[in-house]
């Protein structure tokens, strides 16, 4: 049976080669006679799996030794609480700043409010004229030179790819140039993690839920500058204290072992595709194909300011919304799955993560073209 093209925003498609290897090793990992799901998290077999996954991730992103790499539980939303519990009080008065560009940065801001004094440094939550064009809320990124970052903040948080609204930062700002040299950047990179090169040293902390580009739901990767950890709030659970997790190499408590194993297979798959530079080239080609067609017709519309359009998550609407149900039914019949947009914005969304080949995007564009011929 042919597998359909899965455009889910997450949990998302995994590389077929990874799924096949996991199936082959399900009952016996590397001659151990055990499934990874049956291993002690402190036994030599899983220690080997976990340490190799960390080594491969460090290699892919060029993570230096003065940064800790941690595999944690709780997902991206959980990390929105774990980050402030670990960092917000590191300079005494608990304070953190946020750049709001969509749903997930807004959720992060709200969650951090439980732990200290939070401040909006910039927001795209209102309509604005950008490059001479009127942009709706959450379809643009405030220029960095307009951000109001407090020099006393413990960190500045941004979501570098908004999964729902389809907005992506093309670069991360230099906070020293904004008058805040002592404020580290915290980046939620969940939905474009490993999709392109990222200079992790530009951030004090980066985190990413695996279920977009790096594996199944259940594990979150955290890359943190070591001098920032060890100052958790007293209320922080010990299992979520970065100092504990880093000291025990992600095995302070029982980790999500199978999810880490799959993530490790994905890391090796990414390396085999040419690393993050190879993934960037492939992802650029896919995005250019899809956006190119959407921009060529008035039948569909992507509302995001072109320079900050996400290569991973492509929201679009049909000009005639009465056709939405017919569009989705036809897409499923054509083997194009999970194209319905998020309930908060409606319309459609095609998530074209690393595991989606160019062939799948071509199939989507052909369907878009055919549907327009029939209903346009």
Swiss-Prot record:
SUPFAM superfamilies registered for this protein in UniProt: PLP-dependent transferases
Binding site for pyridoxal 5'-phosphate: 104, 163, 188, 211, 253-254
Gene3D superfamilies named in the record: Aspartate Aminotransferase, domain 1, Type I PLP-dependent aspartate aminotransferase-like (Major domain)
Protein keywords: Amino-acid biosynthesis, Aminotransferase, Cytoplasm, Pyridoxal phosphate, Pyridoxine biosynthesis, Serine biosynthesis, Transferase
Catalytic activity, reaction form: O-phospho-L-serine + 2-oxoglutarate = 3-phosphooxypyruvate + L-glutamate; 4-(phosphooxy)-L-threonine + 2-oxoglutarate = (R)-3-hydroxy-2-oxo-4-phosphooxybutanoate + L-glutamate
A GO molecular-function annotation: O-phospho-L-serine:2-oxoglutarate aminotransferase activity
Residues bearing PTM N6-(pyridoxal phosphate)lysine: 212
Family stated for the protein in its record: Belongs to the class-V pyridoxal-phosphate-dependent aminotransferase family. SerC subfamily.
Record NCBIfam families: PRK05355.1 (NF003764), serC_1 (TIGR01364)
The name this protein goes by in its record: Phosphoserine aminotransferase
Annotated organism of origin: Bordetella petrii (strain ATCC BAA-461 / DSM 12804 / CCUG 43448)
Gene name linked to the record: serC
